[in-house]
Swiss-Prot record:
Disruption-associated phenotype: Shows no differences in the resistance profile to different dyes, detergents and antimicrobials.
Main subcellular location: membrane
GO CC, one annotated term: plasma membrane
Main function: May contribute to resistance to some drugs, such as deoxycholate, sodium dodecyl sulfate and nalidixic acid, in the absence of BepD and BepE.
Complexes and interactors: Probably part of a tripartite efflux pump, which is composed of an outer membrane efflux protein, an inner membrane protein and a protein that expands the periplasmic space. Could form a tripartite pump with BepC and BepF.
Name by which UniProt lists this protein: Efflux pump membrane transporter BepG
Region (Disordered): 1050-1074
Regions crossing the membrane: 13-33, 342-362, 368-388, 395-415, 444-464, 478-498, 540-560, 876-896, 898-918, 930-950, 975-995, 1007-1027
Inducers of expression: Induced in the absence of BepDE.
Similarity comment: Belongs to the resistance-nodulation-cell division (RND) (TC 2.A.6) family.
Membrane topology term: Multi-pass membrane protein
Subcellular location: Cell inner membrane
An annotated Gene Ontology molecular function: efflux transmembrane transporter activity
Length: 1074
């Protein structure tokens, strides 16, 4: 027998355990640390610009051609795009979890290339960018000038030139990006009146710059081939691209016959300024450059953040005077706090388990064995997780906490059986260990396989939910496998070394005290056996009880709200500020500053970073929107004053509700960063029949109004609207052509004056920047300024646009969004207080069903999509777990009926779990479902050993009811030991506060309630079910095969039935528990 080798050679078992532990400790130093496994779907972004174009023009000219080609690219889940009134286009394609981001990028690039032939020339000239996108925030860094000596232009470009690229090279950083639009550009601000007086047009400026600001490659002198012996070879250089404003000022626009010339400085103001002024960054009211740092997939978040901090400290040494930086948000602070709290919970659970085991065993030496064996299993698990490419995260650590109850049971089974053999036979520890292992080796292996059959199938579920389950299931499975190895090697070896023979033990005060405690436990065991004796005589009632428990669990499952993952206090939330359509940037900035100043004074708030001119919800720059990133003080500090992120959000909502000129929308971070932009649900209303944007907006507003009247929904909103004031230019094309003016020249003149026209590039500061021409401020204020623009006809005459265009006012969309190749309106919302996210999604679906007209549909996206997919998989998960457990139990018992009893006993635990969730008001989310899977395993394990002992006695010829009583009596002590240890180990989860408290309570509550029910009800139900099903089995065997299943029962067993259990309670000193 394998265990005998290690009992005789305990140092070999100890060495194996040390090697496993060392491997785990080494892995702990190398394994990536993150809040969650790598479950954020990879994304690829496509960006393009059509300067001066409206949202509808961008959609028609860019979005539709590109999305028609990209749609259906390999591994795509969904795609969404935004076409803005500022001429920008952004498409985000989201792919399946586990797909290769690089391959995704190549596939999208190939599809976009097919669409480029259908794009406007101006768009392709500026370039269509395709790149993989990191969506998992790591940190937000702001560059600021405490003494206000630097403006936004300097701060933004200092960050772009000196900080962003350096941060992008930090190991573990996937992307570093500046939120600002103040990149350097050579801005040519021309004066329309000056151009008119000199008989020039904006196109003349464009042509002059294009011809004189060029990259020159003029060749070489003396380069081969040469017919004679050339002695020298020289490379020729000349003035190519211009590098500063003075050189651009001297560009010649027109050379006159008399030798005079018109230079750019005669008609325009030239300066090194910003490429775009669409957004303005602030930190606590002062100018700032905001840099977002994203984590690379699969990297160590904590190590990457530490690397960023180190690099910023290095860069700070070379900062000019008056420049500083601040890390205004760091996700790893929450991650580190979460990991710290979970590890603390793990240690607390372990200590409580050890205390319970000590109380039940009553022997310090015996307690020492599981105390040593359990850490080996848990620490060794890290080594396997590292090899599998997993990270140390909340899921894997939760799995270890829950695995303690399973892992400790293996060691308890060994120790308890060795103690029992020593007490009954008087054998010395080594011999007793050998005999005990002969009895339990097969059950340990079989039970391990049965439990693996519960967990392993869960690991094959696809998608994000499947990735969460896989991390959990594989962590528990690895811990169980190592625990089984320990139970066959380390635990029996330690029993042979640590335990003492029962004969001749001296009774100290401590020993006598523990004897009394053990005697009390024995009396409880006798009482339990007495109750079981009565119950098995009414075993048929177990079927009624199981039916009642099953019905109760089912009913509770229908009324307990469902969810995806609980929202947490991550120390940060967003505030989106929206002003009326067409509100100017300066007007928006004033309102943002007012709200910013108010929030900064609130209790618990540390910093407020604002980006005026940016809509976080829509993901584009708009003049009437602003974003505020509110960073809170450390959670430990806020908890002293009982302030959570939800309290601050509620206060912000209350204060901003009184602002008449704006609407403020507060958004907590989503449970998984990178999966959705905020908490709550994300919904896409789709126009599936190509109606107008105005009709889509009308339907969206009607849907939002109906949703907000539903009591299960709150703060449902959409920012999509078509009431933005716009001016529509009608070009008289016939008249223009008759005067020799090309409509294309008219459009280019308008674009150059009003929209900002990209001419070409220039080089300075080691970078390449854009050259942009645009009219001066006074030339683009009113409609009258449009009429003053001139174009040149083919005859050389100057033609004012007043004679070629007319202007009319109209209302139109500020932007247009598309989802999966349909024009769409993005709608976001939240569950009402006390309502789960699952109920909110169901309510929104019902509102959609009754409200949406024909031709309109909807799709869920972000966390809502994942939650619905998870909800659809829950039943499959439990069904797979139960099916595989049943099949392995059939193999264990060589019976098709006995395993049914073991599995039916789990209904008590399921009912208890659902009842606990209902009482506490928690949702049946992924964490709760993870706990229920563990509950199935642990409750099954208790039933397996009770039934195994009863089955062995029955096969020895003991009467059926008596065999059930003996099996229950023999396993009562270790079952209660494991159950109490596990239940007490869950207490730190159930009462958790601090980082990830909602997650810890979610995962702990279901198992806590389930194990209480399984311990209080299941231990009585299991022997009853065994009697019923074994009786059916034997009856069927006798009727079908016409012979008894077992040999003739021994008469002495039957005689003992009247006097109680065959194994009478022994005195504590006989059991060796002193």
């Amino acid at each position: 027998m394998l265990s005998s080798v290690f009992i005789n050679r305990p140092r070999l078992a100890i060495v194996i355990a040390i090697v496993i532990t060392l491997a785990g400790l080494i892995a702990v130093t190398r394994i990536p640390v993150a809040q969650f496994p790598d479950i954020v779907p990879p994304q690829v972004s496509v960006t393009a610009t059509y300067p001066g174009a409206s949202a509808e023009t961008v959609e028609a000219a860019i979005a539709q051609p590109i999305e028609a080609q990209v749609n259906g690219v390999d591994d795509m889940i969904y795609m969404s795009s935004t076409s803005g009134n500022n001429g920008t286009y952004t498409l985000t394609v989201t792919f399946k979890v586990g797909s290769d981001p690089n391959l995704n990028t190549v596939n999208v690039q190939n599809r976009v290339r097919l669409a480029e032939a259908n794009l406007p020339q101006e768009v392709t000239r500026l370039g269509v960018t395709v790149k993989k996108q990191s969506s998992s925030f790591l940190q937000i860094i702001t560059l600021l000038s405490p003494d206000s000596r630097y403006d936004e232009l300097f701060l933004n470009n200092y960050g772009v030139i000196n900080v962003v690229d350096r941060l992008a090279r930090v190991p573990g950083v996937g992307q570093a990006q500046s939120f600002g639009t103040f990149n350097y550009s050579m801005r040519i601000w021309f004066n329309t009146d000056a151009l008119t007086s000199l008989n020039l047009t904006p196109n003349d400026i464009v042509n002059a710059i294009s011809s004189q600001n060029v990259q020159a490659a003029v060749g070489r002198l003396g380069a081969p081939p040469m017919t004679d012996q050339q002695q020298i070879q020289l490379t020729l250089t000349t003035q190519g691209r211009l590098t500063d404003a003075k050189q651009f000022e001297n560009i010649i626009i027109r050379a006159n016959p008399d030798g005079s010339s018109v230079r750019l400085k005669d008609v325009a103001r030239v300066e090194l300024a910003a490429q775009s002024y669409d957004t303005i960054g602030r930190l606590n009211g002062k100018p700032a450059s905001v840099i977002a740092v994203y984590q690379a997939p699969g990297s160590n978040a904590v190590a990457a953040a530490e690397g960023v901090r180190n690099v910023m400290e290095q860069l700070k040494q070379s900062f000019p005077a008056g420049l500083d930086y601040k890390i205004t948000y760091d996700t790893t602070v929450f991650v580190s706090s979460t990991i710290h709290e979970v590890i603390k919970t793990l240690l607390e659970a372990f200590v409580l388990v050890v205390v319970v085991v000590f109380i039940f065993l009553g022997n310090f030496r015996a307690t020492l064995i599981p105390t040593l064996a359990v850490p080996v299993s848990l620490i060794g698990t890290f080594a396997v997780l590292l090899v599998l490419g997993f990270s140390a995260n909340t899921i894997s650590l939760f799995a270890m906490i829950l695995a303690i109850g399973i892992v400790v049971d293996d060691a308890i089974v060994v120790v308890e059986n060795v103690e029992r053999v020593m007490a009954e036979t008087g054998l010395p520890p080594k011999e007793a260990a050998k005999q005990a292992m002969q009895e339990i080796t097969a059950p340990i292996i079989a039970i391990t396989l049965v439990l693996l059959s519960v967990f392993v199938p869960v690991a094959f579920i696809p998608g994000i939910t499947g990735a969460l389950y896989a991390q959990f299931a594989l962590t528990v499975s690895v811990a169980m496998l190592i625990s089984a190895i320990n139970a066959l090697t380390l635990s029996p070896a330690l029993c042979g070394v640590f335990l003492k023979p029962h004969q001749g033990r001296k009774k100290s005060l401590y020993g006598r005290t523990m004897d009394k405690l053990s005697s009390g436990i024995e009396k409880i065991s006798d009482g339990y056996a007495h109750i079981v004796r009565r119950l098995v005589r009414m075993a048929f009632l177990s079927i009624v009880l199981v039916a009642g428990l099953g019905a109760g669990a089912y009913f509770l499952n229908t009324i307990v709200p469902t969810g995806f993952l609980p929202e947490e206090d991550q120390g940060l939330f967003f505030v989106q500020v929206n002003l009326p359509p067409a509100a100017s940037q300066s007007r928006t900035a004033a309102v943002v500053s007012e709200i910013e100043a108010d929030i900064t004074k609130m209790a618990g708030v540390a910093d407020v970073t604002s980006v005026t001119g940016f809509s976080f919800i829509d993901g584009l720059a708009v003049s009437n929107a602003g974003l505020m990133i509110v960073t809170l003080k450390p959670l430990e500090e806020r908890l002293k004053d009982n302030i959570t992120v939800f309290d601050v959000i509620a206060e912000v909502n209350r204060r901003t509700a009184a602002i008449p000129s704006a609407v403020a929308i507060t958004m907590n971070l989503p449970p998984i960063l990178g999966l959705g932009s905020s908490g709550g649900f994300q919904y896409q209303l789709e126009d599936q029949e190509g109606q107008s944007p105005q009709q889509l907006a009308s339907v969206a507003q009607g849907l939002v109004m109906a949703a907000n009247q539903n009591p299960k929904l709150s703060r449902v909103f959409t920012t999509f609207a078509t009431d933005t004031p716009q001016l529509n230019l009608n070009i008289d094309r016939q008249k223009a052509l008759s005067l020799g003016v090309s409509p294309n020249n008219i459009i280019q003149a308008l674009q150059s004056t009003l929209g900002g026209y990209f001419v070409n590039n220039f080089n300075t500061l080691g970078r390449t920047w854009q050259v942009i021409i645009q009219g001066e401020q006074q030339d683009r204020k009113t409609v009258e300024d449009i009429y003053r623009i001139n174009v040149r006809s083919s005859h050389g005459d100057m033609v004012p646009l007043r004679s070629l265009v007319s202007v009319e006012e109209r209302l139109g969309p500020l932007y247009i969004t598309r989802y999966n190749n349909y024009r769409s309106a993005s709608i976001q919302g939240n569950a009402a207080p006390g309502v789960s996210s699952g109920e909110a999604l169901a309510a929104m679906a019902q509102v959609s069903k009754t409200t949406l007209p024909s031709g309109y549909g909807y799709e869920w996206t972000g966390t809502a999509l994942q939650e619905l997919q998870a909800a659809g998989q829950t039943s499959m998960i439990l069904a797979l777990a139960v099916l595989f457990a049943y099949l392995f139990l059939v193999a264990l018992y060589e019976s098709w009926t006995i395993p049914v009893g073991v599995l039916l006993s789990v209904t008590a635990g399921l009912a208890g779990a659902m009842l606990a969730l209902w009482i506490t008001g928690l949702s049946n989310d992924i964490y709760a479902q993870i706990g229920i899977v563990v509950l199935i395993a642990l409750a099954s394990k208790n039933g397996i050993l009770i039934v195994e002992f009863a089955k062995e006695r029955r096969e020895e010829g003991v009467p059926l009811e008596q065999a059930a009583i003996i099996g229950a009596r023999q396993r009562f002590r270790p079952v209660m030991m494991t159950s109490f240890a596990f239940i007490l180990g869950l207490v730190p989860l159930v009462i958790a506060v601090g980082a990830a408290a909602a997650s810890r309570r979610a995962v702990g509550t279901s198992v806590f309630g389930g194990m209480i029910a399984a311990s209080a009800v299941g231990i009585f139900l299991i022997p009853m079910l065994y009697v019923v099903l074994e009786r059916v089995r034997e009856w069927g065997h006798a009727r079908i095969l016409r012979k008894p299943l077992y040999e003739e029962e021994k008469q002495e067993k039957a005689d003992g039935d009247a006097s109680g259990p065959t194994v009478p309670p022994t005195q504590p000193e006989d059991r060796g528990l002193s």
